[in-house]
Design a protein with these regions (language model features):
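Conserved glycine-rich cofactor-binding loop
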Residues: 15-16
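Conserved glycine-rich Rossmann-like NAD(P)H-binding loop of the short-chain dehydrogenase/reductase
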Residues: 29-46
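Active-site loop-to-helix junction immediately N-terminal to the catalytic Tyr of the SDR YXXXK motif
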Residues: 95, 103, 147-155, 167
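Substrate-binding pocket helix/loop in short-chain dehydrogenase/reductase
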Residues: 99-100, 104-112, 192, 200, ...
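Active-site helix of classical SDR
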Residues: 123, 157
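Alpha-helical segment proximal to the catalytic Tyr-Lys
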Residues: 128-129, 170-174, 232
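Short C-terminal tail/terminal secondary-structure segment
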Residues: 146, 206, 224, 235-246
Length: 246
């Protein structure tokens, strides 16, 4: 694929974990990838180097998705470097767990600012600036269906994403842009594993009929399907990539 026809994908929160796996997979599939990060640039820059060593094209761009102006700047950078954007993968997110009665205001605000408002900011920008025949892929979570104690605010922030996904898919009628969400189950990332005992991790791994945790590559494969030609008839849906946990 030559550079003039290469499709361009923005992946938010892409410097590590699931986001990094998505960036690598999309680059392997022929996409130019914008690797968004919000903190330390080193992992994002390292990932750019890895993709370029394999013959791909990538650019790291710092932006806090909870800041609408920063998200607009993220799209500006992509357009200036590569001429436009075809795919948005709304991967950036945080987690904070507590029973509803014990949830701190600052934790609730951060969940809503990043998981909901951050995803909304990127969706809004993509709705205005994505090229026709594009893809918007949001991130929900399988906790929306599991409804576990302690996950209330986190699940709420992700349930809202599923609603926005279905609505935006209808609002973009006529442009051949699909809007879907991926809802991972327990996945072996640092974000998921940190603070958990080996016994708890083993118990969580056994919850799904496939009796293992998901991997970042499992989730990246689901995203790649939705971003590619084979996923073109899927629209307004949430794909639950969780090994059958629900």
């Amino acid at each position: 694929m030559n550079h003039a026809t290469q499709r361009v994908a923005i992946v938010t929160g892409a410097s590590r974990g699931i986001g990094a796996a998505i960036a690598e997979r999309l680059a392997a599939d022929g996409f130019t990838v914008i690797i968004n990060y919000s903190g330390n640039p080193a992992p994002a820059d390292e990932l750019v180097g890895k993709i370029e060593q394999r013959g791909g094209r990538a650019l790291s761009v710092k932006a806090d998705v909870s800041d609408a102006a920063a998200v607009a700047g993220l799209f500006d950078s992509a357009e200036q470097a590569f001429g436009g954007v075809d795919v948005l993968v709304n991967n950036a997110g945080v987690i904070a767990l507590a029973p509803v009665a014990d949830m701190r205001d600052e934790d609730a605000d951060r969940l809503l600012d990043i998981n909901l408002k951050g995803s909304f900011n990127a969706m809004r920008e993509a709705a205005k600036r994505l090229r026709d025949n594009g893809r918007i892929i949001n991130f929900s979570s399988s906790v929306v269906g599991l409804l576990q104690p302690g996950y209330g605010m986190y699940a709420a922030s992700k349930a809202a994403i599923e609603a926005l996904t279905s609505v935006l898919a209808k609002e973009l009628r006529g442009r051949n842009i699909t809007v879907n969400a991926v809802a991972p189950g327990p996945t072996a990332t640092g974000l998921f594993l940190d603070g958990k005992t080996p016994e708890l991790i083993e118990r969580l791994a056994k919850m799904a009929p496939l009796e293992r945790l998901g991997t970042p590559d499992d989730i990246a494969a689901a995203v790649a399907f939705l971003a590619g030609a084979d996923g073109g008839w899927i629209n307004g849906q949430t794909l639950r990539a969780n090994g059958g946990i629900i």
